[in-house]
Amino acid sequence: MDSVPRLTGVFTLLLSGLWHLGSSATNYNCDDPLASLLSPMAFSSSSDLTGTHSPAQLNRRVGTGGWSPADSNAQQWLQMDLGNRVEITAVATQGRYGSSDWVTSYSLMFSDTGRNWKQYKQEDSIWTFAGNMNADSVMHHKLLHSVRARFVRFVPLEWNPSGKIGMRVEVYGCSYKSDVADFDGRSSLLYRFNQKLMSTLKDVISLKFKSMQGDGVLFHGEGQRGDHITLELQKGRLALHLNLDDSKPRLSSSPPSVTLGSLLDDQQWHSVLIERVGKQVNFSVDKHTQHFRTKGEADALDIDYELSFGGIPVPGKPGTFLKKNFHGCIENLYYNGVNIIDLAKRRKHQIYTGNVTFSCSEPQIVPITFVNSSSSYLLLPGTPQIDGLSVSFQFRTWNKDGLLLSTELSEGSGTLLLSLEGGTVRLVIQKMTERTAEILTGSSLNDGLWHSVSINARRDRITLSLDNDAASPAQDTTRVQIYSGNSYYFGGCPDNLTDSQCLNPIKAFQGCMRLIFIDNQPKDLISVQQGSLGNFSDLHIDLCSIKDRCLPNYCEHGGFCSQSWTTFYCNCSNTGYTGATCHNSLYEQSCEVYRHQGNTAGFFYIDSDGSGPLGPLQVYCNITEDKIWTSVQHNNTELTHVRGANPEKPYTMALDYGGSMEQLEAMIDSSEHCEQEVAYHCRRSRLLNTPDGTPFTWWIGRSNEKHPYWGGAPPGVQQCECGLDESCLDVRHFCNCDADKDEWTNDTGFLSFKDHLPVTQIVITDTNRSNSEAAWRIGPLRCYGDRHFWNAVSFYTEASYLHFPTFHAEFSADISFFFKTTALSGVFLENLGIKDFIRLEISSPSEITFAIDVGNGPVELIVHSPSLLNDNQWHYIRAERNLKETSLQVDSLPRMTRETSEEGHFRLQLNSQLFVGGTSSRQKGFLGCIRSLHLNGQKLDLEERAKVTSGVRPGCPGHCSTYGSICHNGGKCVEKYSGYFCDCTNSPYEGPFCKKEVSAVFEAGTSVTYMFQEPYPVTKNISLSSSAIYADAAPSKENIAFSFVTAQAPSLLLYINSSQDYLAVLLCKNGSLQVRYQLSKEETQVFNIDAENFANRRMHHLKINREGRELAIQVDHQLRLSYNFSSEVEFRAIRSLTLGKVREHLGLDSEIAKANTLGFVGCLSSVQYNQVAPLKAALRHATIAPVTVQGTLMESSCGSMVDVDVNTVTTVHSSSDPFGKTDEREPLTNAVRSDSAVIGGVIAVVIFIIFSIIGIMTRFLYQHKQSHRTNQMKEKEYPENLDSSFRNDIDLQNTVSECKREYFI
C-alpha cells in the first residue's frame, strides 16, 4: 500500500519537472544578444537629449554614445521593439560613452504590444537591478525567471549625481515559438476522442492564457456517471472543478475543488498546470501550487466523447453555452501530451472549431495607476457649458476610501464629487455649503476587481450606474440645471490648487483606472504621458500595478487576510494565535510553564510547538504535586463491558483524544515520562497468551502498530505485570486473566514506553464463550516533566559555541530564550547567509541588540533596560521578524517594534550553521547560561549538544536567585538540576508555591494542643524535613499569624502558656478582638480591638508581632495597635499552644475561662507561631508531631465556610485524577443492567436511610423543643445577621452530649 503514494509522488515530480523544463527560460542556448542587430528605429524613449534616436546598443560609440533623456527625472524610459515575442534571459547596461552619464539602478518592464506593460518582479516584489558605476564598464544580470515579450523597457531609478541619465543596453535570449488561439467570448474549440469514452488514471493539462474578463470557462469535460473536470475564471481567479465517479455534485451546483490565483484578468500571460494521479492532484497557477485530494470513489476520470475549450456547448443547441465563455487568448494548450491548438491549426478531424482564430488580438487599452494617497491625480479637460454631463470609467482598488472624480460644473451649477467611501460609491453635487444631490450605490467595491462607473446628467436629473447595470441605476434630482465642467480631476487634487476647481474631503485614490470617457469622448492617456493632454502627478501610465498582497496568504494558522493598496492585515480571531501575522501562540508550551507562572491545577490549552504548525490542545494540568502532571482525556475512560467477541468478529474501540496524533506526539516527546493505566477485568476471557502465540487482546499505539503486551510489562514481552513478578493466579501463564477462571479477576498496570503511546485502539476477541465476559478501562494519557523548559547550557570561554543546522525562517522568525551572565557583552546567537544575517547579543550591561538583514540593509533594534542585565539573574528575550514588523522584548519591558518595508526583499535567506553562544569568527562569544532556546517553536536540545562540545557544560545551577520569590508564606526555594521547588515545611501553607491554606473546622469541644516540652523520643526516627515541627521553647519574640471565621462570641481562638506566662487571643461577648499578655511577672496586658464585630461569619486575618518591648497587632492587613512594654519581656519555657478549647483549664484567667467555656466554633486557617505550624502539624504530621487533637477536627477551606454552615462538609474528588477513577476489584459498569438483585439492594438501602433520617430528625426536634424556652433569652443577644446554624451551635453548648452527637450526625 505504501508504494502507491510513493509512485504517485515520483510521477508527479517527474511531470512537474518536465513541464518546468519545457516552460523555463534556462534553455542552454538561450543567451544570444538580441538588441545589437536592431535598427535605430526599434528604439524609442520618453524623450531624447538630441532630438534624435542615438544608438543605444551596448559598446556603441557612434553618435552621442548612447541614450540620454532631455530631462533626468523619474518619468524617463528607454524602450526597444524586438520584432517578435522572444525568450529573454538576461540584460546588460553601460553608461553613455565618454561622459559622466550613467544609471546606478533601474527596473525592467515588458509587453507584447507596447501597451499594458508588466513590471519584472522577483520574490513577489518589483525588482531593482544594480546599474553602473562608470560610463564604460558592463553590468550584466541573468534573470532568475525568463520573460517572453516583444517589447522591453528600461526605467532608470537612480543615476550618477554628478551627471545625468545615460544608457547603452543589451538584451539576451532566443526565439520563442508557440501555438495561440483567440476566443471572442462566443465560440469554443472541441477535441473529439477516437472512442466514446476516455478513461484516464493520470492526466497532465498545461496551458497559458491572457484575458481582460474576470469570468469564463477555459475547458470542460464530463461523463455520464458524474465524472467531470472544469477549469474556469471566476472573478479573476481560477477555479478547478474535479469529481471522480460521483453522480451527486454537478458543475452547476458544486463548489470548486480548489481556487487559485488572483487578478488574472490583467491581460497578461498566466501559466496553468494540472497534474493528476488517481485522486491526488497538483494545481499550479503561475508560481503558486496547491495539492489536494479530489472527491469521488474511483481513481479514473471518465470523460465521454469530447473536451471543450473556451466554453461549454449545450448539446443539440449550436451557439448556446451552459456558462459564460472565455474571452481572451490561450497558448500552448496540451492535454496528456496532445497539442490541441496545433491540431486545430492543421484542421485535424478530431478538432471542431467555432469562431476561433490563431493569433492573439490585443485590445489597445491603456490603464493608469494612482500611486500616492496624497499627491496622485490626473487632470483631463472637458467641454464646458454643454447642457448636461457624461463621464464614465473603470477602476479597481483595495482601499475602502478615495476620491474618484472632482469637477467644478459650469454656469454656477456647483461641484460634483464622486468618491469611494467604505467600499461604496458616493456621488455628491455641492453648491457653496448646500448639498443639492447625493447618491450612494454599491458595496465592497474595494475587492480588487474592475468596476465600471457611469454618470449622466440632463437638466436637473442625474443618474449613476455601476457595473453596467443600466436596468436599475441610482438617480436623484437637483434644484439647478447641470452643465459640463471645464476640468476633471481624477483620483485627487494638486497640492497647489487654490481655487474651488477641485475639492477632496478624503484622501486621494490609490488604484487603477482605464477606459475614461468625458462627454462621450474617449481620452487618450498616452497623450497625457507625452504631455500633450491634461496634466498628472505620481501616476504610472500604461500600467496597472495592483498587487494581491494576500496571495499567498502570509497570515499563519488559518488567520484571515485582508488588504489595502499598500499592506495586508491579519485577523487572528478564533485561531489560538496572535501577532501581526498570527504567528505567536496564545498558549504556553507545557503545564510546567503554567506552573512557573504561578498557576494552580485546572484545564489549560498547551501548544507544544509554539509558533509551529500544530495547534493548541486542551489538557488538565495537575499542579498540586511535586511532579506537574499533564492529563489528556479521551472519549471512553469509563469501565466498558464486552460480550460476544471472537476472532472472526472482534470487538474494537477507537479512542479520540480531541487532538491530532501530531499534537499528542509533540506533547509526549517533550515530556520526561508518560503513562496510561490499562485495566482488563475478566471472567473466562483470556488476555494475551494462546497456544500459538497470537494474543486474544491487543492495543494499537501511535504508529498504528499492534502491541501484545499489557500494563506493567516492557515492550516486546507478551506479559502482564504479574508475569514479571511471578504473582499471577496460574504460574503457567503470565497474566491473571489467562488462567481462564470462572470468576472475576483483573490485570491492571501502566504502559509507559513513550514511543508507543498513546493507546489509540483496543481489540478484544475472547468473550464469546459461555459465562465469558470482559470489562476494560484505559485511563487518560498522563505525562510529567518538560524536557526543554529547564534545558540549559553554560559557556565559560569566549571562543566556545554550539552549532546547529541552519535556521530556516524565510517569512517568519521568532527566537526566545532565558539567559544569565555577569559578562559585559557577548553574542547569544548568529546565523549568516550570502548577504542576509540574523544576530542577537547583549551589547552592554543594560542593552540587548537584535540585528537582521533580509537584503534591504541591516535593521537594528536595541532595548535599554533601566537595571543591569548582567546581574547573574535569569532574564527573558523574545525576538521576532515577520513580513509586517520586527520586534524585540526583554523581560517585561515595553516591546520595541519597527515596521517592515512593504517593498524590496522580504525573504530571510540563511545558509550557514546556527551558532549559539558565539560567532563563526570565535569573537565576542557569550559567557554565561542560556536556557529554553526556541526557534519558530522548535526546541533546541542544548544539553545534549553541550555534552560533546568543549568549553561548554550542560545545565546551569542557580534558579532560586531569580525565582525564589515565587515561594510564598515562608516557603523556601530549593534548587534542583532542572529547576527548583518550594519547600513548605516551615510554612503554615502548602502546595507548589506554599500558597494553599491549611485550615479546619472546629466544634465546641475541639482542641488542638501543641506541646513544646522536650525531649521527644519520636525525634530520633523522623527525617530532617520534619525538623521544623519542633521549635525552641524559649523564644525572645513572637510572630503569630492566622485567619478565622466564626459567629460565636465569646470564643477562645488561641492560647499559649508556660508555667508563669501566657498569651491568649479571644473574642469578647460583643465580638471585639482581645489579646491578653502575661509576661515576666508583669501585670496582665489587655489589648482590645473593637473596630467591628469580628464574629460576623467573615474571614479575618490576624498578625501579632512582638520583639523585645515592641508589640504590633495587625487585623485584616491594617495596623490596629502598637505598644511598648516597660521592660524587656520574653516567654520562658513555653509548655503548649492550644487552638480551640483548653482542656486543662486550671489556673486560667477568669476572662479566658469564660471564653473557654464555649470553646471555639468556626474555622481556623494557616496558623503559625514563629517556626511552628500547629494546625498543619495536626492535619499533616499527627503521627510524628507533638500535637494532640481532642474532639472533631474536620479539614476544610475557611474561604468556603463564609456564609455556609461550618458543620456541613462537602466531599470533593481528588484533583490528581480530574476525570474520576474506579479501582474496585469487581468492575462497575456504565451500561444499563437488568440485575434484579442489584435493584432490590439499592431500594432496600434507600428505604433504610429514609427511615433513619426520620428517626434522627424526630429525636432532635423533640430535644430542641425542650431547650427552646431556656435559650430564648440568649437568642436575643445574637447579631441579627447570624445564620441559624451558628446560633444552633451555640445554643447546644448547654445540652447533653448525647444531643450534640445526634445533631452533628
Swiss-Prot record:
SMART domains: EGF, FA58C, LamG. Residues 1258-1305 are cytoplasmic. The keyword Cell wall biogenesis/degradation does not apply. Residues 584-790 form the Fibrinogen C-terminal domain. The keyword Signal applies. Residues 180-360, 367-544, 791-956, 1000-1198 form the Laminin G-like domain. InterPro entries: ConA-like_dom_sf, EGF-like_dom, FA58C, Fibrinogen-like_C, Fibrinogen_a/b/g_C_dom, Galactose-bd-like_sf, Laminin_G, Neurexin-related_CASP. Residues 1-24 form the signal peptide. Belongs to the neurexin family. This is Contactin-associated protein-like 5. It comes from Canis lupus familiaris (Dog). The gene is CNTNAP5.
